[in-house]
C-alpha cells in the first residue's frame, strides 16, 4: 500500500529490486497520492514488469491490500508499506527456502530493525522482551512484526481483511491466522520499520483506541474487563485531545503508563 510517502517510496521499491530471488511480483495499491508517488511507481513499473500498479483509489489501507491481493498469483504473500523496506538482499530467498524446508508451517515471522527517517538503523525490534512472552500470549498481546511476516496464500484467501478497521486491521488478521494456522518465528532481521513522526500507529488516538476495544470484543466478548478498561482509557484520550500541548503530554504519559501496566501484568491488561 502507498499513500503520499514519496519521500520513502524509492527506498522501499529499491529494497525489493535488489533481492537476489527473482521470481516475485509486486502489486502496488496507491490510495490517490498527490506528492509524486504515482510518478515513482509508474517509473518502476515501466522498468520492471514484475511491478504492477493495480489500484489508484481505496477506502483505507486494508481495502488497498485486499484489492492488491485479489491479483496475487504467488504461493507466499506479504505486504510492505511504502515507508518500510527490506534490509538484506536475501530476504525473499530466506522466506522461500524456509517455507520449502518446513512444509507444515503456514506463517513465517522474521526479525527487523527500527530505522529513522533517513534510513539509518537505530535498534533491533524486540517484541518478545517480556520473560513470560510467547505464542501462548498471542490472545493477550498479538505481537507481530508486520513487514517481516509472510504467509501461504491460502491464509489470507480464507481469512480475508477486515476493511472496517483502519488502525489495527493487521493485528486482527494476524490474530485470526494465529488461531487457525501454524507459525514459525526466526530472528533473522529482514525488514526495516521506519519511525518518521507520521506513523499511523505511533500515537495514542481515540479512533485507534476504539478499534482496540472492538478487537478485544472479538477475543473476549463485549462484557470483558479488558473492553471496559480500554473504554475508560479512550474516554481520557478524547478529553486530552482537546487540550492542546498539555493534552499531547498527557497522552504520552498515558501511553507509557498503560503499556507499563500491560507489561507488569504479563499482558492480562491490554496495551495501547
Question: Model features per residue range: what roles?
Answer:
Residues 89-122:
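Conserved donor NDP-sugar-binding/catalytic core segment of glycosyltransferases
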Residues 23-32, 52-57:
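Short beta-strand/loop segment that forms part of the nucleotide-sugar
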Residues 77:
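Short aromatic/hydrophobic "clamp" motif used to bind/position activated sugar donors
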Residues 14-23:
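Short, acidic, metal-binding catalytic loop of nucleotide-sugar glycosyltransferases
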Residues 55-72:
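Glycine-rich, basic loop-to-helix element that forms the pyrophosphate-binding segment
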Residues 36, 63, 84-98:
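Acidic donor-binding/catalytic loop of UDP-sugar-dependent glycosyltransferases
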Residues 30-39, 81:
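A conserved acidic beta->alpha catalytic loop
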